[in-house]
Regions:
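N-terminal helicase ATP-binding lobe
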Residues: 1-566
Length: 566
């Protein structure tokens, strides 16, 4: 107890010097110790929690009347007859939203953004809320949470073609969001989660999927015009460059952690005399057999997943559980006795990557969240980017994403998966390969070609250059000369939300105009009842389009028009 008092004294001294970040870290470590040793908080500990703004961590059983009053003052309705005490920074963000402010927030993974969204819906009771998320998996996760709380009052929409009700909560990735641009008359608040995926971090594109980046910017821009209020979220951004999509929004970087991350730079202990892979395997065995709590293992590729899984199967590593036994039995029945995932599940190990069927990934995520479920999850970036899950321990097996080294921004996102508010005060990270150099990531947003082709340039006269507008109109007139006046824009509007590249659309129109008889023969081929014969009809078409695409790359004033996929 004397040691606790000394720690509290240190926290108090640092607090008086205004060193709040260090104060929070020391206090959070102390709270983890008290939890592990099953020691109740003293009034002094509660007082320091209050002073640092970590209000939800106050122990009611040992609190005084001032702390109990504060807990009630910061308690908000988050839907489903549930009230939650927000920490100081959550409360500040919620207050700004309730006041109608447009916010772009950069905050740690452990910030607790879901509570803010749910509290806003419960308190403001808006008619139409649109939440854009990066993946279908995250849309499913958000839908389940909102359905539990708001299904009695709202129509919760996650797919296309659903009839709207007087009050709607829309939750979907950008591709589906674009299908509702014309059917939603107005939006009370547009929420873009992980909006950094729409841009570039320090000049480097976040993802290679150019089409999805363009669609996200397009969804933000077109739906944003119908929104009374906007709320954008991202982690680890230090600066938001001036851009037309966040005009009028207040950018706020929130440096407020609710968990402490203890990083072990394991790679520094490697002797250099042994095989590096062998040393990594040795440390992985140590971590899995000695550390308590759930563990996420980040790897860079499917090949690395296989290598790590093979090593784990060699270990005397078991996690007996009736639910895992049942799941492993089902996997063997469905996929065969030798299916590696079934063997791993019996050991309490799961796998998450883009090649797995989505239902298998969802089952494993839910099992990882359960106390008697999976104890460890081996994952590529698919889990880091697409699902809100975390663990007490994170093992960073590789410093690459696929074959290229990831940047500091990605590294911080992986590290941010360790620890969880209310569950693990302290998260542990084991870095098995040298991380990238620390930087201060800034975000840039710009117009993609899909948006330039779809928008009415006259509506963006203050945001596009005169030359850009002139070239857009010239291209539109050229296409209309083949199709008829106004037909090209109608066609683009219909097809772009389905992910059709505007570049290929223009090339196909040109090809059809130049070789009408060839295209008539090709289209007739679709009437063939034997699908195998379709290939011969389309082989020549595909070759000509690819050839045209390579020759017709056009650059429109810093807006490159080029095909990303076909």
């Amino acid at each position: 107890m004397t040691d606790v008092f000394e720690q509290c004294k240190l926290v108090s001294d640092l607090l008086n010097r205004g060193e709040e970040v260090e104060v929070r870290n020391i206090l959070i470590i102390l709270l983890q110790r008290l939890k592990d040793d099953n020691i109740k908080y003293t009034p002094l500990v509660n007082h320091l929690i209050r002073e640092t703004g970590l209000y939800p961590y106050i122990d009611v059983s040992t609190s005084d009347w001032q702390e109990r009053f504060l807990l009630e003052a910061f308690k908000v309705d988050v839907g489903g007859n549930q009230k939650v005490t927000l920490h100081r920074e959550q409360s500040n963000v919620l207050k700004a939203l309730l006041n109608g402010e447009d916010l772009a927030i950069s905050a740690p993974t452990s910030f607790g953004k879901s509570f803010i969204i749910d509290a806003f819906i419960a308190m403001k009771k808006p008619d139409n809320v649109v939440i854009i998320v990066p993946t279908i998996a995250l849309a499913d996760e958000t839908r389940r949470r909102l359905y539990h709380k708001f299904s009695g009052e709202y129509n919760i929409i996650t797919t296309i073609g659903v009839e709207l009700a007087p009050k709607n909560l829309f939750v979907f990735p950008q591709e589906r969001a674009l299908n509702y641009v014309d059917s939603i008359e107005y939006i009370d608040i547009l929420i873009a989660d992980e909006f950094y995926k729409a841009g570039k971090i320090q000049g480097r594109q976040i993802k290679s999927e150019d089409r999805r980046i363009g669609l996200l910017i397009e969804a933000i821009s077109l739906l944003g015009k119908k929104a009374t209020q906007r709320y954008f979220l991202a982690p680890n951004i230090t600066e938001l460059k001036e851009n037309p999509f966040t005009q009028g929004m207040q950018f706020k970087k929130v440096d407020f952690n609710t968990v402490y991350t203890d990083i072990e730079y394991t790679y520094k202990s490697f002797s250099g005399n042994q095989d590096k892979e062998l040393e990594k395997c040795g440390h992985l065995e140590r971590i899995l057999t000695t550390e308590t709590g759930k563990t996420l293992i980040y790897v860079n590729s499917h090949k690395s997943i296989h290598r790590v899984n093979t090593k784990i199967l060699e270990l005397d590593f078991n996690h007996p559980s009736s639910i895992l036994t049942s799941f492993a039995f089902w996997l063997k029945e469905s996929y065969g006795e030798d299916y590696m995932l079934a063997k791993l599940v019996q050991r309490g190990i799961g796998v998450h990557n883009g090649r797995l069927h989505r239902s298998l990934s969802q089952i494993q995520i839910r099992l990882f969240e359960k106390e008697d479920g999976l104890n460890c999850l081996v994952s590529t970036s698919s889990l880091i980017e697409g699902v809100n899950t975390s663990a007490r321990n994170v093992v960073i097996w590789s410093n690459k994403n696929s074959t290229a080294k990831y940047d500091y921004f990605t590294y911080k996102n992986i590290v941010g998966r360790s620890g969880r508010m209310f569950k693990h005060f302290v998260g542990k990270v084991f870095v098995l390969e040298e991380p990238p150099e620390e930087t201060s990531p800034s975000l840039e947003l710009d117009y993609p070609e899909t948006l330039l082709e779809r928008i009415d340039p006259t509506e963006y006269s203050g945001k596009l250059t005169d030359e850009q507008i002139a070239k857009i109109k010239q291209h539109e007139r050229e296409m209309d000369s083949f199709l008829g006046r106004g037909e090209y824009r109608k066609l683009v509007k219909e097809l772009v939300s389905q992910g059709v590249s505007n570049v290929y659309l223009s090339i196909i129109i040109n090809e059809m105009h130049k070789n009408p008889s060839k295209w008539r023969r090709t289209m007739k081929g679709l009437l063939e009842t034997n699908p195998n014969r379709w290939k011969s009809f389309f082989r020549s078409y595909y070759a000509s389009v690819k050839k045209s695409a390579s020759l017709q790359r056009a650059t429109w004033n810093n807006c490159a028009f080029y095909p990303s996929s076909i």
